[in-house]
UniProtKB/Swiss-Prot annotation:
Enzyme Commission no: 3.2.1.17
Species whose genome carries this gene: Pseudomonas aeruginosa (strain ATCC 15692 / DSM 22644 / CIP 104116 / JCM 14847 / LMG 12228 / 1C / PRS 101 / PAO1)
Function field: Toxin secreted by the H1 type VI (H1-T6SS) secretion system into the periplasm of recipient cells. Degrades peptidoglycan via muramidase activity thereby helping itself to compete with other bacteria. To protect itself, the bacterium synthesizes immunity protein Tsi3 that specifically interacts with and inactivates cognate toxin.
Activity regulation summary: Enzymatic activity depends on membrane binding.
Reactions catalysed, as given in the entry: Hydrolysis of (1->4)-beta-linkages between N-acetylmuramic acid and N-acetyl-D-glucosamine residues in a peptidoglycan and between N-acetyl-D-glucosamine residues in chitodextrins
Subunit structure: Forms a heterotetramer with Tsi3 consisting of two Tse3 dimers and two Tsi3 dimers. Formation of the complex inactivates Tse3 enzymatic activity.
Compartments in which it is found: Host membrane; Secreted
Disulphide bond pairs: none
A single GO molecular function term of this UniProt record: metal ion binding
Keywords, alphabetical: Calcium, Host membrane, Hydrolase, Membrane, Metal-binding, Secreted
Highest taxon above the source species: Bacteria
Name under which the protein is recorded: Peptidoglycan muramidase Tse3
Amino acid sequence: MTATSDLIESLISYSWDDWQVTRQEARRVIAAIRNDNVPDATIAALDKSGSLIKLFQRVGPPELARSLIASIAGRTTMQRYQARNALIRSLINNPLGTQTDNWIYFPTITFFDICADLADAAGRLGFAAAGATGVASQAIQGPFSGVGATGVNPTDLPSIAFGDQLKLLNKDPATVTKYSNPLGDLGAYLSQLSPQDKLNQAQTLVGQPISTLFPDAYPGNPPSRAKVMSAAARKYDLTPQLIGAIILAEQRDQTRDEDAKDYQAAVSIKSANTSIGLGQVVVSTAIKYELFTDLLGQPVRRGLSRKAVATLLASDEFNIFATARYIRYVANLASQQDLRKLPKTRGAFPSIDLRAYAGNPRNWPRDNVRALASEYTSRPWDDNLSPGWPMFVDDAYATFLDPGMRFP
């Protein structure tokens, strides 16, 4: 036995006048697990005494059960298999388990496995520990009012009013505009921002803690976006500044209303193929290019539904890694192209060096950044360019390279 297992058994035990685990007791159980220095020994002791199954059966409601499951999955190693088996047995009389609300797309065991894989990846890739974090924006509408600015997760936004849903279905111009990208003239928007405004936006984006669906899978508080971007940059031989620039550009042209529309459409009966989250990753792109490969093992990825993929894209760490992995894919693809067959690209970006894309962006000509920005948002290297977007991303990149920019 351990001190934590003794405490947990006392909190989940029933008596003649105590036939349920209260919310307060459940929170004490979860806190004990999260603060335990020997979690594997505690799980082994609970398993040996027959209390491990009871733990999973008795701690609720679903949001607290998920917190419990994530805390155990993220902290165990030697005893993770035993914990998973106990969880399976606990679901015999409650097959839905934690599948409520947005979690309907994740069977309880899948949720356990995602938390376990994420915790392992965070430790392996160096973004498990929390870092210094900044303050979110309070903007609720207009440019730069989506998750990148506010930290409000798309899955937490209210359902779009039924009247607006009908108007969107009928393509009412005013309603479509309300739920679409807010910027028309990208250059005009940038001209309204001072250098300090741009720095403030960039710092707001990267300084916040990640907006994650799996906070309890981390050993402490979730890490900052800057920390996750830095980890993704190391993994894919990129720079955090390039990842940050791509995301900042996407988030400048994003609103809270559009976040709501894109996510809710993706998980609706239509399963719309929308772009979701920080890097505005398209659901089909995440699936086709297996953009979660470095955070989730193949068994988990293979079992994800399309709506589960859409939901994971709303979680910052998954979106940042998906964005970075796709940037690297587009860059590697460029290094294999023949510039003579891309006359429009060569004309628009005269300093482009396709071979340089195989290496780190620190060694790219600036035109490489601009060209990649165009190809990130469309079919890559088909010689059809995205008007205005290369310079829009380049402006964000310049902000991240500014000496006044603090990248935690």
